[in-house]
Amino acid sequence: MANNNSAKKRIQIAERNRIQNRTYKSAMRTLMKRCFEACGAYSEKPSEDAKKDIQNSMNDAFSKIDKAVKTGVLHRNTGANQKSRLTSVVKKTIEPVVK
């Protein structure tokens, strides 16, 4: 346990930041799941509305990821990895491979 006041305050600040980061990451994951679900819906029933839903959900997820990187919740490489993962899934869904 911390002995001086500054160490006690650092413990409080670390706990506060942990909770804030946790909620931010949870919101980011939720937006990513929505994008994946939109891709699944488009795969089952392709339409222009479904395509717009994919684009909107991807833009929302990208925005949240970028803000998480900017505020220090995520490392920039982790953010880039998540965005790459989303992009590849969306690209495979919208533009199927033609042989």
UniProtKB/Swiss-Prot annotation:
Record's Gene3D superfamilies? Ribosomal protein S20
- Record GO biological process: translation
Q: Which gene encodes it?
A: rpsT
What biological function has been recorded for the protein in this entry? Binds directly to 16S ribosomal RNA.
Q: Which organism is it from?
A: Prochlorococcus marinus (strain SARG / CCMP1375 / SS120)
Q: Which InterPro entries match?
A: Ribosomal_bS20, Ribosomal_bS20_sf
Q: Does the keyword Transport apply?
A: no
UniProt-recorded name of the protein: Small ribosomal subunit protein bS20
List the NCBIfam families hit by this protein, alphabetically. S20 (TIGR00029)
Q: Family assignment? A: Belongs to the bacterial ribosomal protein bS20 family.
Which molecular function GO terms apply here? small ribosomal subunit rRNA binding; structural constituent of ribosome
According to its UniProt record, what is one Pfam family this protein matches?
Answer: Ribosomal_S20p
Q: Name one GO cellular component term.
A: cytosol
Keywords associated with the record? Ribonucleoprotein, Ribosomal protein, RNA-binding, rRNA-binding
